Design a protein with these regions (language model features):
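Conserved coil-to-alpha-helix start sites within the AMP-binding
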Residues: 86-91
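PLP-dependent aminotransferase-class I/II
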Residues: 99-123
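N-terminal "arm"/small-domain region of PLP-dependent enzymes with the aminotransferase-like
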Residues: 1-32
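Phosphate-binding glycine-rich loop
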Residues: 34-79, 93-97, 103-105
Length: 123
């Protein structure tokens, strides 16, 4: 790797319509994580996953992790396995609920959680 060369973790996919949606949200003063665009997104996603499923859009990935942990019943004294190659928002909801994050290292070639180390951690 050359000095100063960046490794991008992901590239954003833009369809070209984003600026119009942003302008619409500002024009209608819906610049908070609610409003007609959020409602439409939730409804579209409910139709996609099936009408028997419910969808809730959240303002941040941290909020989504927190809600998922609550839905799983995670609480005081629990341990939650977390990938070590992550942003702190992956572990903060764990500690907020009184649980302990247990970090597992990643594979060098994929950057995904190492399944061998995961198995060792579970044992």
């Amino acid at each position: 790797m050359k000095n100063g060369e960046r490794i991008l973790l992901c590239l954003a996919h833009m369809s070209g319509k984003e600026m119009g949606f942003i302008k619409e949200a500002f024009d209608q003063n819906w610049v908070v994580p609610l409003g007609p665009n959020v409602n439409a997104f939730e409804q579209d996603l409910e139709r996609f996953v099936g009408q028997d499923k419910k969808v809730v859009a959240l303002s941040a990935g941290t909020a989504a992790v927190h809600l998922a942990l609550l839905a799983c019943g995670v609480g005081q004294g629990d341990e939650v396995i977390v990938q070590s190659f992550t942003f702190c928002a992956s572990s903060h909801p764990v500690t907020y609920l009184g649980a302990t994050p247990v970090f597992v290292d990643s594979e060098a070639d994929t950057w995904n959680m190492d399944p061998v180390l995961l198995e060792q951690t579970i044992r």
